[in-house]
A protein has these predicted regions:
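Hydrophobic membrane-insertion alpha-helices, especially the h-region
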Residues: 13-24
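N-terminal Sec-pathway targeting helices
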Residues: 2-15
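Beta-propeller blade termini and top-face loops
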Residues: 24, 28-576, 663-925
Length: 925
């Protein structure tokens, strides 16, 4: 018995902090306008704020609006008690291995410059042994993957801190921002194997949750046992290699600098404190601003850098909120200060935009580093990177233009810059695009991300040929088509913040992508060019200045080759057979060939043969005998001919012959979508010139979910829209508003049933809707919510009281079976199942079982096993093989991948044994 191959792909996202991650695939055996517009926006307005709000909405408790660290720690404790990993699912990374994601920490080994470490905020710690040319992950996949800081002790030991304080856990108690909590400090004595320091393990049931964010960690220059750490629970110091810690300062500490001489500068609630002994501190900032003072500055961020050449040279950058306040320099160890830069029209590395669209990110992305060979030279990074020198002032040293070969390109949102301790001309910097390197003191840069699989995906689509299209935070939309030099290298095909993505199975060159805040696009050339396909009906709420959509707008594509209710048709006109023999040369007289017809069932009529070559003509009789200016024969059964011209022709030789199609002939026509074959059978004889029309069963529907709005003049704006024209690139599709969900209700996720008749829509406020009878809606009148003839029905079938319904799946074998996942800490159930989802009043039952109580973001049935459900969660993949039982048992299924949030799961569902090496089974390209 031949077995089909079932494959899964899961979108992985960052643990501990925000989302990071890579695409992965698992396998196991189972039973059977201007269209070409290239969008490259690196700095779309409001990206970071929307990103934060989107994540926080899915994770925070729906009542308090906060994330209780105690709930996070309790869920982690439950996770550790979950059934051990099984070998049912074996994950393989699908990269991308040629680009990187957000990275906050870097380290060059003090004894060997070839060894470099990079800490991503969601993909773990990576190590390079060739100066950054390639990378391998070294952090334990079961450990916390949110690396926020790293250092090397005098004896070579490596320490890294987890948690990204710039997104939350900035103090004690409840968290009102979206980050994924860290789990203290990890240490390695060999640079490869790391263990968690028990002394930094967050208390499992403590609301204060110290050590959930280690913003910075630095090692004493000579004492290998002395390490300092800036944490959400205070400024900490160990003198025994991390066995125990002493709190030097209370409160949330975010930034400090430790000089080559052991001098410390630390930001304590806006005051700059200095210590020369690592124990006692003196303030070097002042409450009163003078020309030589360093002001206190609360409510923003402060970073420091001390020259390794001269301990007296200290630099400090302060932000006013997220905007640049000023940059200061001291040449006397902090006794006096001078301002060397402040926010201005020509100097503003932390903000972007114009007028009302200006946004700043100085809290999120900020670094300050002094040159190791020139104490009068410093780099400042934020959205862009600048450098200052005592002789040249401020100069922008990077651009955001990612064109091939640009030596000044650095990805937006820079977080760190370090200097090789063994070569002051070698510099590494990290940003939301991974790791970049300079060999000439920052004059030019090149990307160093080979094998650094740390992209942060929100959504993705799987093509019929198993190519992947995915949307990433701050890295746009990437296309994995397996043509890269690296095994899993991607092409960046679209900019901004990417989100939901899809690839047509009818025409794999047709793709769909989006950017933040409801902007969506399509491509018909494999991602080379893109164009929006929205219209004024969809954008009415945006035009009215009302909330338009979720930060990542849900959309859904449905396609079929067997739509029995299709009202579209393919017209066919029978044409004669024709063959060109090319041009004569005035010498050759004999020509042989065969006429091929587009319809193999066509019968040729010998008596209609005509042969022309300029003024020369010949015909054939019913027996196929050719006469006139040429002689020869035409064989009616095969359409083969041999002719000899009396005079060698010099014009083009054309042979034509009429045909007919007998009744019950099999035809192959071309669909309007992708010119795919449409099979038909004639009902009577067809002669040349006759027309034949057949139903076109190859159809598609495309759905988008926008925020529903109501005003006095327009009571139904926004909502759920569909089009049947998404494959027609000659025009803007006709959109139909098929559902209005109530004022200010925002869709979060969508899933259509396999038969295309039901669309399930979840919202950010806990509701689940079923939109049915889609197959019967073939016109605007039948589909529109405002039409008296509408056949579509909209039914609310679930309500989870303000929680975000994060994911939906419909059993591909039974549309009555619908599973949903829910977010929001502080609840007791995160997975629900309905077995009567098409009923007038469906019911949903909790399928929490022994699944840890953390937010879940995606669900998927197994097409080959109705008792199996996959769940993508805060900490990876879980599976229940008894989902139909009252209390399912879950196993952790993270074999081959880290414990990272999984925001989308796609099963490669087909009964067709696809063979990529067989052109017959390959989709038409």
């Amino acid at each position: 018995m031949k077995m089909n191959r079932t494959r899964f792909a899961a979108l992985l996202s960052g643990s501990a902090v925000l989302l990071a991650g890579t695409a992965a695939v698992l396998t196991w055996d189972a039973q059977p306008a201007e269209r070409h517009y290239q969008f490259r926006d690196e700095l779309a307005q409001g990206r970071f704020a929307g990103y934060n709000e989107y994540l926080h909405m899915m994770r925070a408790n729906q009542v308090t609006g906060e994330i209780d660290p105690a709930a996070v720690q309790a869920a982690w404790a439950q996770l550790l008690q979950t059934a051990q990993k099984t070998n049912t699912l074996n994950w393989e990374s699908r990269g991308p291995d040629n680009h990187g994601g957000r990275t906050r920490s870097l380290l060059v080994n003090r004894n060997n410059s070839n060894i470099v470490y990079a800490g991503s905020v969601g993909g773990g710690l990576y190590r390079s042994t060739n100066g950054g040319a390639s990378w391998n992950v070294v952090s334990d996949p079961g450990a916390n993957q949110a690396i926020g800081s790293i250092c090397q002790a005098a004896n070579g030991d490596i320490y890294y801190g987890t948690g990204e304080i710039w997104l939350g856990y900035g103090g004690t108690g409840q968290n009102t921002t979206p980050n994924f909590a860290g789990r203290g400090v990890y240490k390695s004595t060999d640079g490869v194997n790391f263990v968690q320091l028990a002394s930094t393990l967050p208390a499992s049931n403590s609301a204060s949750a110290a050590w959930t964010a280690v913003a910075d960690i630095e090692a004493h220059p000579t004492d290998a046992n002395t390490i300092f750490a800036a944490t959400n629970g205070g400024f900490m110091k160990t003198t025994d290699g991390g066995a125990t810690w002493t709190q030097l300062m209370s409160g949330s500490i975010t930034d400090f600098a430790l000089s080559a001489a052991g001098t410390i500068y630390v930001n304590q609630a806006g005051r700059t404190m200095k210590s020369t002994d690592g124990a006692t501190f003196t303030e070097v900032s002042a409450p009163v601003v003078t020309s030589t003072s360093l002001p206190r500055r609360a409510g923003g961020r402060i970073r420091y850098s001390v020259s390794p050449q001269d301990d007296n040279y200290v630099y400090c950058v302060q932000t006013n909120g997220s905007a640049l306040a000023a940059v200061y320099r001291s040449t006397d160890g902090g006794s006096t200060w001078s301002k060397i830069g402040q926010k201005g029209s020509n100097f503003d590395p932390l903000c972007n935009g114009v007028g009302a669209d200006v946004y700043c990110q100085g809290i999120f992305d900020l670094f300050l580093t002094v040159s190791a060979k020139d104490k009068d030279h410093v780099w400042l990074g934020g959205i862009t990177v600048w450098q200052w020198s005592a002789t040249g002032g401020w100069v922008q040293s990077s651009t955001l233009n990612d064109f091939a070969g640009n030596p000044f390109y650095l990805h937006a949102d820079s977080h760190e810059l370090i200097v090789d301790p063994n070569n002051p001309d070698v510099i590494f910097t990290s940003n939301d695009g991974g790791v970049f390197k300079s060999n000439n003191h920052g004059a030019t840069w090149f990307e160093r991300n080979l094998g650094y699989n740390t992209y942060q995906y929100f959504g993705f689509g799987v093509g019929k040929d198993r190519k992947l299209l995915g949307g990433c935070q701050d890295n746009g939309t990437s296309y994995l088509d397996y043509t890269s030099v690296s095994p899993h290298g991607v092409k960046k095909v679209f900019g901004g913040d990417g989100g939901h993505s899809d690839i047509s199975w009818l025409n794999p060159k047709v793709m769909f992508a989006e950017t933040q805040n409801g902007n969506f696009y399509r491509s018909d050339d494999g991602g080379e060019g893109w164009a929006t396909f929205s219209n004024a009906l969809l954008t009415r709420t945006r035009t009215a200045g009302l909330p338009y959509s979720n930060w990542m707008m849900p959309f859904e594509l449905w396609e079929t080759t067997t739509d029995a209710q299709s009202q579209d048709s393919v017209s066919f006109e029978l044409l004669p057979g024709i063959r060109s023999m090319g041009f004569g040369d005035g010498i050759k007289r004999v020509f042989k060939g065969k006429i091929n017809h587009s319809q193999p069932a066509a019968k040729f009529i010998a008596s209609t043969v005509q042969i022309t070559a300029g003024a020369l003509t010949a015909t054939a009789n019913a027996n196929g005998v050719v006469s006139g200016d040429a002689t020869g024969v035409f064989y009616e059964d095969s359409a083969y001919f041999e002719i000899t011209f009396n005079t060698p022709p010099i014009a083009e030789i054309i042979v034509t012959c009429d045909v007919y199609l007998p009744a019950n002939s099999s035809l192959t026509l071309k669909s309007a979508i992708g010119a795919l074959p449409v099979r038909a059978t004639t009902t009577s004889r067809l002669d040349v010139g006759d027309e034949f029309k057949v139903q076109d069963p190859i159809q598609s529907m495309f759905f988008v979910g926008l925020t529903s709005q109501t005003t006095a003049t327009v009571p139904k704006m926004g909502g759920v829209f569909m089009t049947r024209d998404v494959h027609d690139f000659s025009k803007t599709p006709e959109w139909w508003q098929i559902a209005h969900l109530g004022s200010n209700v925002t869709p979060h996720y969508m899933k259509v049933s396999a038969d295309g008749n039901h669309l399930f829509v979840s919202t950010t406020s806990g509701r689940l809707y079923r939109i049915s009878n889609l197959l019967a809606a073939r016109t605007l009148s039948q589909a529109s919510v405002d039409s008296a003839n509408a056949v579509i029905t909209v039914t609310q079938i679930g309500n989870w009281n303000g929680r975000v319904v994060t994911g939906i799946d419909v059993d591909p074998n039974d549309p009555n079976r619908v599973a949903v996942s829910l977010g929001n800490y502080g609840n007791s159930a995160y997975v629900y199942l309905s077995t009567n989802a098409l009923a007038s009043v469906p019911s949903f039952t909790s399928k929490q079982g022994d699944l840890p109580m953390f937010p879940c973001y995606s669900v998927s049935f197994d097409k080959g096993n109705p008792n199996r459900l996959f769940v993508g969660s805060e900490w990876g993949m879980f599976m229940a093989d008894n989902i139909n039982s009252a209390t399912p048992s879950y196993s952790e299924e993270n074999n081959g991948m880290a414990r990272v949030p999984v925001f989308e799961i796609e099963q490669y569902r087909t009964d067709f044994n696809y063979d990529p090496n067989n052109p017959i089974s390959s989709p038409t390209e």
